Amino acid sequence: MLIFFCGKMGSGKTTLSKKIATQTNGIRLSEDELLSTLYPNRITNLQEYKQYSDLLKPVIEGITQQLLRKNLSVILDFPANTPTQRSWLKSMSDQEKSSHLCYFLDVSDEQCIEQLLKRANPMTDTKEMFMAVNKFFVTPQIEEGINIQEVDSETLK
């Protein structure tokens, strides 16, 4: 099974991904962790994020498909915040005839910003970055053909 997450910056996607990885004994891959390890201090704006994120995607796709072929649960802590991102994630499970689930974290902007400002990266974890990234956020729709599990802020506590 492939599990992925949709939620605004600071909504708790990483926290939930870690919890689910523990519960399912699945393999968790995190875009933030990979980017910060492979490209330390190189991402300071959205353009740089996209550039480096795009370099990861073909590698992650291959690894994910290999794991799904082995019937392992894969928890991808990669953003599923646009229809294009969700389509890419879903396509990996479709190609391997594996099931998928998208957790949608429905958390208010105020709560996201509050959580974001508590995080460790002062270069990217700012209200300004939240507003810039949030412009691209699209709530997932069942018409996209994805299995959605909604999670509210109370459930995340």
How would you describe each model-predicted region?
Residues 96-115:
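Conserved phosphate-donor/acceptor-positioning beta-strand/loop module used by diverse small-molecule
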Residues 2:
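Walker A (P-loop) ATP-phosphate-binding motif of ABC ATPase nucleotide-binding domains
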Residues 15-72:
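Conserved substrate/cofactor phosphate-moiety recognition/catalytic segment
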Residues 52-96, 100:
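Glycine-rich phosphate-binding loop used to anchor ATP phosphates in small-molecule kinases
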